[in-house]
């Protein structure tokens, strides 16, 4: 009879997804209640500010000017991706910790933005990186950061050395 760790793969890493989801939602609640739309609070002059922005589209406001159908399209995509990530986590081996962390980060971020999209009709963004008043990166949130870190980890995982045909993940 297989033990629980073998049967459930790396699903124990779902705690990290839940942590990302909680931090994301608490931070969004804080900034939404503290700032008015597009207000900026400078943290590091010329480089970093807090702000409040709503994004009805995807990354970089892709399709944000749609009539509302994009809300449900992006929600369905997030649900499908989340299901794939859970199955992938379940199938990971004991030695694939790096990959488990990456997947858990992406999953937590996807769920954080999915909640916003379904419950609010938009995603709350509050982190603004800029250079003086000349260049602004699109506003983003904690969930976006977790997705980005997880995606970079997944990309780096593809380049790890291989031993006996298996990727080394720890």
UniProtKB/Swiss-Prot annotation:
One of its GO terms (cellular component) is plasma membrane. One of its GO terms (molecular function) is aspartic-type endopeptidase activity. Its EC number is 3.4.23.36. It comes from the Bacteria. Pathway: Protein modification; lipoprotein biosynthesis (signal peptide cleavage). It catalyses: Release of signal peptides from bacterial membrane prolipoproteins. Hydrolyzes -Xaa-Yaa-Zaa-|-(S,diacylglyceryl)Cys-, in which Xaa is hydrophobic (preferably Leu), and Yaa (Ala or Ser) and Zaa (Gly or Ala) have small, neutral side chains. Disulfide bonds: none annotated. It is found in: Cell inner membrane. Keywords: Aspartyl protease, Cell inner membrane, Cell membrane, Hydrolase, Membrane, Protease, Transmembrane, Transmembrane helix. Coiled coil: none annotated. One of its GO terms (biological process) is proteolysis. The active site is at 125, 144. The chain crosses the membrane at residues 11-31, 41-61, 69-89, 95-115, 136-156. It is a multi-pass membrane protein. This protein specifically catalyzes the removal of signal peptides from prolipoproteins. Belongs to the peptidase A8 family. This is Lipoprotein signal peptidase. The lineage of its organism: Bacteria, Pseudomonadati, Pseudomonadota, Gammaproteobacteria, Pseudomonadales. The gene is lspA.
């Amino acid at each position: 009879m297989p033990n629980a760790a073998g049967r459930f793969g790396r699903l124990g890493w779902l705690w990290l997804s839940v942590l990302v989801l909680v931090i994301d939602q608490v931070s969004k609640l804080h900034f939404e209640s503290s700032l008015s739309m597009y207000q900026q609070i400078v943290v590091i002059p010329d480089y970093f500010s807090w702000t409040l922005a709503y994004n009805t589209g995807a990354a970089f406001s892709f399709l944000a000017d749609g009539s509302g159908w994009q809300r449900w399209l992006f929600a369905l995509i997030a649900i499908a991706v989340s299901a794939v990530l859970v199955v992938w986590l379940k199938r990971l081996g004991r030695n694939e910790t790096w990959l488990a962390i990456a997947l858990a980060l992406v999953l937590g971020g996807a769920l954080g933005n999915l909640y916003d999209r379904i419950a609010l009709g938009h995603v709350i963004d509050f982190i603004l990186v800029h250079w003086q008043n000349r260049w602004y990166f699109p506003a983003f949130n904690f969930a976006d950061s977790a997705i980005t870190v997880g995606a970079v980890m997944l990309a780096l995982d593809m380049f790890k050395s291989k031993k006996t045909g298996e990727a080394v993940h720890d």
